[in-house]
Amino acid sequence: MGKGGNYVMVAASEVEELRQKNGEMEKAVEEMRKEMLQLWRRTQVAEEAEEHLCSQLAELEAESLDQARDYHTRIIFLTNQLSRFSSDSASP
């Protein structure tokens, strides 16, 4: 490369090489953008699935709590009945 004043003289082969590298880099950047977009979409799907699962889990937790309360009420009822029957059979 020779210098002419404030300008740098670049050979035509170097210009072509730089253009080729620039084109390759632009393709690489575009490919990275596509990959990033795909990853972003997959992340969105995963986040939506997580929200759905959390919602289902909350519903199941509420349902299990209701069932536990029902079972507890039933156990108390049966315990009271058993106690009453035991005391009735023990009485003359």
Swiss-Prot record:
Taxonomy, superkingdom: Eukaryota
Keyword Coiled coil carried by entry: yes
KW Coiled coil (keyword) present: yes
Any one GO biological process: cellular oxidant detoxification
Induction: Accumulates in response to phosphorus, nitrogen, potassium, or iron deficiency.
KO phenotype (gene knockout): Defects in flower and inflorescence development in short-day conditions and delayed flowering.
Coiled coil: 8-63
Keywords: Coiled coil
Stored PANTHER family: PROTEIN RESPONSE TO LOW SULFUR 1 (PTHR34283), PROTEIN RESPONSE TO LOW SULFUR 2-RELATED (PTHR34283:SF5)
Function summary: Required for flower development in short-day conditions.
Protein name: Protein RESPONSE TO LOW SULFUR 4
Organism: Arabidopsis thaliana (Mouse-ear cress)
